[in-house]
Regions:
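Structural core segment of the AMP-binding/adenylate-forming
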Residues: 81-134
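Short hydrophobic/charged patches on amphipathic alpha-helices used for structural packing
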Residues: 14, 48, 98-99
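Conserved AMP-binding/adenylate-forming
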Residues: 29, 33-35, 48-93
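Flexible, non-catalytic linker and terminal segments flanking ANL/adenylate-forming cores
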Residues: 1-7
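AMP-dependent adenylate-forming
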Residues: 12-36
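Glycine-rich phosphate/oxyanion-binding loops and their immediately adjacent helices
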Residues: 45
Length: 134
C-alpha cells in the first residue's frame, strides 16, 4: 500500500503570495473589486485565526452560505487554513434539496449572510447540529 501525502490547497496560496505578491489573484466582475495574492493570503490567514479563536476546530464541517465572489473565495481559503471542511451547497438545487443536504451533512458551524441565518430560524430542525454561527 502506498503512503498518501496530505496536502492543503492553502499552501499554494502562500506560495503564490511569496512569488507574486502584487499580482492580481481575484477580480470580482460585478463590483470591480480586486485582491492581490498577498492581500488574499493575509486576509484569509486573519480570518482563519478568527475562526479558530471563535471555537471552530480542525476537521469540523462548516456550512458556507455567502454569494460567490471575493468574500466567498477568501472565506474558503480561511476555512482550509483553519483545517475546517467547507460544506458548499448549490442554492440552485432548490429549497427542499438544500435543506435535505444540510440535514444530511450535519455541519458543526455556519458562515452565512443574514438571509441564511433567518432561514435557519424558520427550519431549526435542519440546522440543529450547528453550534457556531458567523
Amino acid at each position: 500500500m502506498t503512503k498518501i501525502e496530505t496536502f492543503n490547497i492553502a499552501a499554494r496560496l502562500e506560495h503564490w503570495a511569496d512569488q507574486k505578491p502584487e499580482s492580481v489573484a481575484l477580480i470580482e466582475m460585478r463590483s470591480g473589486r480586486q485582491r492581490t495574492f498577498k492581500e488574499l493570503e493575509q486576509e484569509s490567514s486573519r480570518l482563519a485565526s478568527g475562526l479558530i479563536q471563535f471555537g471552530m476546530k480542525s476537521g469540523e464541517r462548516v456550512l458556507l452560505m455567502v454569494p460567490y465572489g471575493i468574500d466567498f473565495v477568501t472565506l474558503t481559503f480561511a476555512m482550509f487554513k483553519a483545517g475546517l471542511i467547507p460544506v458548499l451547497i448549490d442554492p440552485g438545487l432548490g429549497k427542499k434539496n438544500v435543506l435535505k443536504c444540510i440535514k444530511q451533512v450535519q455541519p458543526h458551524g455556519m458562515i452565512a449572510i443574514p438571509l441564511a441565518h433567518a432561514i435557519k430560524k424558520i427550519f431549526p430542525g435542519t440546522f440543529k447540529s450547528i453550534q457556531h454561527n458567523v
